Amino acid sequence: MGKSKLSGAWGEALAAEFLRKKHYSIVAAGYSCRFGEIDLIATDRKYLVFVEVKLRKSANFAKAMEYVDRRKQDKLRITASMYLSQNPTKLQPRFDVIEIYAPDATATIHPEIRHMEDAFQ
């Protein structure tokens, strides 16, 4: 497993813990199908939340959210549709992005976490 995959797994675990502290329930992590992958799927009161986690060393070059372009959003929507066809729910779907800025991609320096709810609007 490469370094970026390890860092990505660390970022997703950190994001899941962040969501739990905000009283979300994690339903799935690393859901994948032939259309793509969704980092986290969680519930928040009336929403089934599909979460894209972006881990960066800093926001100096570009904000992590800028890496979730229209093409990536479309891929996430299609993947979420597949998940919903396999796991029907009465909850409203929502797409969130969690940006994590960690200078060394570890817990040695406290990372900055930003949560954008309904990020694709």
Regions found by a protein language model. Give the residues of each.
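Residue-level signal for inorganic ion chemistry
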Residues: 19, 76, 95
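Short acidic/glycine-enriched loop/turn segments that link adjacent beta-strands
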Residues: 33-36
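Domain-level recognition of nuclease-like catalytic cores that cleave nucleotide substrates
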Residues: 86-121
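Acidic-basic catalytic patches of nuclease active cores, encompassing PD-(D/E)XK
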Residues: 1-29
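Mg2+/Mn2+-dependent nuclease catalytic core
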Residues: 57-81
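Conserved catalytic cores of phosphodiester-cleaving nucleases, focusing on short active-site segments
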Residues: 38-61, 76
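Secondary-structure boundary/capping motif
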Residues: 24, 29-30, 49-52, 114-118
